[in-house]
């Protein structure tokens, strides 16, 4: 496949991630930190995000089992995940973390459970979408990494 076409596909996928609310401007700022010395910076940061966020979610699941209805503990775990999402630009996951924290504030265990399932689902969908995006960028080569979606 032609490299220009791959770059267009990557740009289109990135735009759709913004249009669908998966990403926010923070992700562009992460990508802007890439340079010739570290052309895979954004992909490496995203990889670390998923490694860390997966660990946080596993710790959270353990906290739910060991400390049922300990809303303060649950909120602390979710705040950590929300912060990670904010720093990488994972907008939909971050927004669901906010919903979860609201349920914690209401001490609504059922709402927390439903919201956490949404967090996990959004996290999994974003992982798949980002994997597709970075795969296209790797195929296109370094010149395909510096495109900012229109209007962002």
UniProtKB/Swiss-Prot annotation:
Q: Where is the HPt domain?
A: 38-140
SUPFAM superfamilies from the UniProt entry: Histidine-containing phosphotransfer domain, HPT domain (SSF47226)
- Phenotypic consequence of gene deletion: Dwarf, narrow leaf, sterility and small grain phenotypes.
Biological processes annotated in GO: cytokinin-activated signaling pathway; phosphorelay signal transduction system
* Single GO MF descriptor: histidine phosphotransfer kinase activity
- Alphabetical keyword list: Cytokinin signaling pathway, Two-component regulatory system
Q: Which InterPro entries match?
A: AHP1-5/YPD1 (IPR045871), HPT_dom_sf (IPR036641), Sig_transdc_His_kin_Hpt_dom (IPR008207)
Which top-level group of life is the source organism from?
Eukaryota
Q: Offer one Pfam family short name for this entry.
A: Hpt
Q: Does the keyword Repeat apply?
A: no
Query: Cellular component per GO?
Result: cytoplasm; nucleus
**Parts forming coiled coils:** none
Q: Which PANTHER family match?
A: PHOSPHORELAY INTERMEDIATE PROTEIN YPD1 (PTHR28242), PSEUDO HISTIDINE-CONTAINING PHOSPHOTRANSFER PROTEIN 5 (PTHR28242:SF42)
Q: Tell me, in a sentence or two, what this protein's role is.
A: Functions as a two-component phosphorelay mediator between cytokinin sensor histidine kinases and response regulators (B-type ARRs). Plays an important role in propagating cytokinin signal transduction.
Query: What name has this protein been given in UniProt?
Result: Pseudo histidine-containing phosphotransfer protein 5
Can you name the source organism? Oryza sativa subsp. japonica (Rice)
Whichever gene encodes this chain, its name is PHP5
């Amino acid at each position: 496949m032609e490299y220009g076409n791959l770059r267009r596909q990557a740009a289109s996928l990135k735009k759709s991630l913004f249009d669908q609310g998966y990403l926010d401007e923070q992700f562009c700022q992460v990508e802007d930190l890439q340079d010739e010395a570290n052309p895979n910076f954004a992909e490496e940061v995203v990889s670390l995000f998923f490694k860390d966020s997966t660990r946080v979610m596993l710790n959270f699941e353990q906290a739910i089992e060991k400390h049922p209805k300990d809303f303060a503990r649950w909120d602390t775990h979710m705040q950590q995940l929300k912060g990670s999402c904010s720093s990488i630009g994972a907008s939909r996951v971050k927004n669901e973390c906010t919903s979860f924290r609201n349920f914690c504030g209401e001490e609504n265990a059922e709402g927390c459970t439903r919201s956490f399932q949404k967090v996990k689902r959004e996290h999994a969908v974003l992982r798949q979408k980002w994997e597709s995006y970075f795969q296209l960028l790797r195929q296109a080569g370094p010149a395909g990494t510096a495109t900012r979606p229109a209007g962002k």
